[in-house]
UniProtKB/Swiss-Prot annotation:
Cited Pfam families: FtsJ
Keywords for the protein's UniProt record, in alphabetical order: Cytoplasm, Methyltransferase, rRNA processing, S-adenosyl-L-methionine, Transferase
Binding site for S-adenosyl-L-methionine: 88, 90, 111, 127, 151
GO cellular component, one term: cytoplasm
Location(s), subcellular: Cytoplasm
Endpoints of the signal sequence: none
Protein name in UniProt: Ribosomal RNA large subunit methyltransferase E
The EC number(s) this enzyme carries: 2.1.1.166
Active-site annotation: 191 (proton acceptor)
Enzyme class: transferase
Function in brief: Specifically methylates the uridine in position 2552 of 23S rRNA at the 2'-O position of the ribose in the fully assembled 50S ribosomal subunit.
Recorded family membership: Belongs to the class I-like SAM-binding methyltransferase superfamily. RNA methyltransferase RlmE family.
Catalyzed reaction equations: uridine(2552) in 23S rRNA + S-adenosyl-L-methionine = 2'-O-methyluridine(2552) in 23S rRNA + S-adenosyl-L-homocysteine + H(+)
Length: 239
C-alpha cells in the first residue's frame, strides 16, 4: 500500500511536557526502571523542548540541521529523497532548506509507518524494501535526486552487536539505492550504529563518492552508539 500526500496543515502538536511529566509521576510505580529513566531523560532533553517550540515532529530534525550547517548538503532547488521518513522531522528540515512547494514537491519521504501530511513533501506510505519502492520514489520526485537521506534504524533489541548488524543491513540497502539513483555530484547521508561491521559499507561509499565523513552531531546523545556516515560528491554510475 502506498500513500502520496502533497499538503498539510502543519507540524504535530501534542500534550505539553509538564502534563506528560505529571502523568509519568503518577504511573512511576507501574513502569520499569529503564523505561522511567528514558522518560525522565526525554522530558529533560532540551532538543525535545526545542522541537516542540519550533514545530518539528522529532528532535532528530536538529541532527540534520547541525550536519547541514557544517557540510551544506541541502540547498535551494534541490531534489531530496528521505528513507525511513516517519514521523517527518528530516522531511520538514529538507523542505524548508530546498524551498519545496506544495504544488510541486521537491522532497519525497517514504516509510511503512503512517505519516501525517507535511507542506512541500510528497509521502509514500510503503515499505522501502518493496520491489516497487525505488521506481515509485523516482516517479513521485519526477527526476533523480540531488541528495538521499536515510535515518532508518531497525527496532533495537538491547543487544548492541545485533542492533549494529541489523542497522548495517539497512544502511547497505540505502547505499545501493543511492548509488542507483543519485545525480553525479550528489550526496548521501545515513545513520548507522558503531560496532565494527561497517567495513564493506565504507569501502562501497569510498569507491563511489569523493569524500566520506563520520559525523556525530551535537543533537546525537553522547552516550548513544549512533553515528552518521556522510558521503559527498557521487562519482556517477559506472556501467
Amino acid at each position: 500500500m502506498k500513500k502520496t500526500t502533497r499538503r498539510t496543515a502543519g507540524g504535530r502538536g501534542g500534550a505539553g511536557s509538564h502534563e506528560l511529566y505529571q502523568r509519568v509521576k503518577k504511573k512511576a510505580g507501574t513502569i520499569k526502571a529503564s523505561s522511567r529513566r528514558w522518560l525522565e531523560r526525554h522530558l529533560n532533553d532540551p532538543y525535545v523542548h526545542q522541537s516542540k517550540a519550533d514545530g518539528y515532529r522529532s528532535r532528530a530534525a536538529y541532527k540534520l540541521i547541525e550536519i547541514n550547517e557544517r557540510y551544506k548538503i541541502l540547498k535551494k532547488g534541490q531534489k531530496i529523497i528521505d528513507l525511513g521518513a516517519a514521523p517527518g522531522g528530516w522531511c520538514q528540515v529538507a523542505a524548508r532548506l530546498v524551498e519545496s512547494k506544495d504544488y510541486n514537491p521537491s522532497v519525497v519521504g517514504i516509510d511503512y509507518l503512517h505519516m501525517e501530511p507535511l507542506p512541500g513533501v510528497a509521502i509514500l506510505e510503503m515499505d522501502f524494501f518493496h520491489e516497487d519502492a525505488p521506481q515509485e520514489l523516482i516517479s513521485t520526485l519526477g527526476s533523480k535526486p540531488d541528495v538521499v537521506l536515510s535515518d532508518m534504524a531497525a527496532p533495537t533489541t538491547g543487544h548492541r552487536q545485533t542492533d549494529h548488524l541489523r542497522t548495517i543491513a539497512l544502511c547497505e540497502a540505502a547505499v545501493h539505492f543511492s548509488i542507483s539513483v543519485l545525480k553525479p555530484g550528489g550526496h548521501f547521508l545515513t545513520k548507522t550504529f558503531q560496532g565494527g561491521a561497517e567495513g564493506n559499507l565504507l569501502a562501497t561509499l569510498k569507491q563511489n563518492f569523493k569524500k566520506v565523513h563520520h559525523v556525530k552531531p551535537p543533537a546525537s546523545r553522547a552516550e548513544s552508539v549512533e553515528l552518521y556516515l556522510l558521503a559527498l560528491q557521487f562519482k556517477g554510475k559506472t556501467d
